[in-house]
Amino acid sequence: MVLQKNKAMTVDLESIDWAVFKTAYGTATFVPKLIVQLAGNNHEIAMGASHELWCALCHQHAYVSSAALPSLPFILKVLDGANDALSVEILDILLGFAVCETDGTENAPWLEQLRAEVTRAHRRFRALSSSQNETVAYFAVAILEKIGEKNLEMLQLL
């Protein structure tokens, strides 16, 4: 089942032209490999991939890169099945998506869309905010605070 899930994810990842997106390190052509590793069965490799994604997509919470937008749905899918340790790392990435601005070198119409997509995932964060794992709960609450109740109210009107 996991193999089929990862194969479907790989097909979906390959349908995106990652070369048009940027990371902190340049073009995002390496991001799909990291997402596949994040979703894989090897916990150590997944944890390493989470760190690399954190550095590349929301560069140490200093700024967010355009590759965050196409990465988001895949990262959210992985979060749904992640253990607590991996969930903490993924939530840290997602917090970066919620709080970081761009590095200022590019026009960033995608940033508003990224924030809207993070806001649409609020039910996941609400569920995780009551996790028995205090760190998971902390990050989920932090994301909810950053996306704000005003944004959630606007979503309910849509």
Model segments located where?
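HEAT-repeat alpha-solenoid elements in large eukaryotic scaffold proteins
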Residues: K5-L13, H43-A56, L91-G104
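Short inter-helical turns and helix N-cap capping residues of alpha-solenoid HEAT/ARM repeat scaffolds
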Residues: N41-N42, D80-D84, Q132-N133
